[in-house]
Amino acid sequence: MANIRKSHPLLKIINHSLIDLPAPSNISTWWNFGSLLGICLGLQILTGLFLAMHYTSDTLTAFSSVTHICRDVNYGWIIRYLHANGASMFFICLFLHVGRGIYYGSYNYLETWNIGIILLFALMATAFMGYVLPWGQMSFWGATVITNLLSAIPYVGTSLVEWIWGGFSVDKATLTRFFAFHFILPFIITALVIVHLLFLHETGSNNPTGLDSNADKIPFHPYYTIKDILGFIIMFLFLMILVLFMPDMLGDPDNYTPANPLSTPPHIKPEWYFLFAYAILRSIPNKLGGVLALILSILILILMPLLHTSAQRSLMFRPIGQCLFWILVGDLFILTWIGGQPVEHPFIIIGQLASIMYFTIILILMPLAGILENKIMKL
């Protein structure tokens, strides 16, 4: 009789995805982040479910319901901070995962890459709506400013914004629908993750060299399960340090003030993981231009496979490409820093230069580096 994990219709799928999956023998720690993202998603759904049991999506009681969770609910404070800082860990893993994909040329798996970009947009939407729910000052004004960007769309913009708000300003209707969407989106994301994995398993994983690894495969379990567990322990350690020692480090102090439509905070900014895109948005003096740049800063990832000019898939043996990649990483750090600064000299010009640099590296310099490296290879 065959092993049940190989014969049972349901267990067979899990077996082929997580146990007997043939994996390249040389994938490094950079390949850990996919599983870590899965763990993060599970943690967010679980903690979010328990928070939703006590949260009320009403403008009059939302802020006090979050306070109630932290003060009166058994271990409510740890559930709340696990959820808030879990989102930060989620985005750290996400950026590293996407960075790995760019560095090692994983974007050449078109379906997997494009589903990944859809996932990225879905996660950003979910995180943004989640930030509105505690109904603090930054929640309210962040929601007002970001949703207001849609009014830049010609002709239909204003109607669209009022339709999203459910009125003439961010109010009770907005909060209620944001809570509904914030609750449902993670389950849609889970479905997309399954599709993401389905497409990945059609081709198999890429590896650091970017070469075909069919000649040298090893089973996923036990080799990579144990490696993923190590990654999970390290991530959980960092998360618990954040949650237990500095839970508010990545948050905004303004969010401890209940939302007040009559008082604008001196500096409105989103969560730290959106600051790079926010800096690109602010670097363009025109509203519509800024919104387009904001969308393109993420949508540019779709062009990655088209902009690949090198004969080699990975950046592992491409020194010029490597230099440009790490300059791009540095540029993203600068943009993140600028996004959190007030709009004044010298931050404006730094933000504009960093934004130009971001698009120039991806659209012009990286493809040119690929062509140049091809020519050097033929010498």
UniProtKB/Swiss-Prot annotation:
Co-factor remark: Binds 2 heme b groups non-covalently.
TM spans (from-to): 33-53, 77-98, 113-133, 178-198, 226-246, 288-308, 320-340, 347-367
Annotated positions binding heme b b562: H83, H182
Misc. remarks from the entry: Heme 1 (or BL or b562) is low-potential and absorbs at about 562 nm, and heme 2 (or BH or b566) is high-potential and absorbs at about 566 nm.
Name this polypeptide is given: Cytochrome b
Record text on subunit structure and interactions: The cytochrome bc1 complex contains 11 subunits: 3 respiratory subunits (MT-CYB, CYC1 and UQCRFS1), 2 core proteins (UQCRC1 and UQCRC2) and 6 low-molecular weight proteins (UQCRH/QCR6, UQCRB/QCR7, UQCRQ/QCR8, UQCR10/QCR9, UQCR11/QCR10 and a cleavage product of UQCRFS1). This cytochrome bc1 complex then forms a dimer.
Compartment annotation: Mitochondrion inner membrane
UniProt: a ubiquinone binding residues: H201
Role according to the record: Component of the ubiquinol-cytochrome c reductase complex (complex III or cytochrome b-c1 complex) that is part of the mitochondrial respiratory chain. The b-c1 complex mediates electron transfer from ubiquinol to cytochrome c. Contributes to the generation of a proton gradient across the mitochondrial membrane that is then used for ATP synthesis.
PANTHER family assigned: CYTOCHROME B (PTHR19271:SF16)
SUPFAM superfamilies named in the record: a domain/subunit of cytochrome bc1 complex (Ubiquinol-cytochrome c reductase) (SSF81648), Transmembrane di-heme cytochromes (SSF81342)
Gene behind this protein: MT-CYB
GO terms for cellular component: mitochondrial inner membrane; respiratory chain complex III
GO terms of molecular function: metal ion binding; ubiquinol-cytochrome-c reductase activity
Family: Belongs to the cytochrome b family.
GO biological process: mitochondrial electron transport, ubiquinol to cytochrome c
Cofactor (UniProt): heme b
Protein species of origin: Myospalax aspalax
Keyword Iron in record: yes
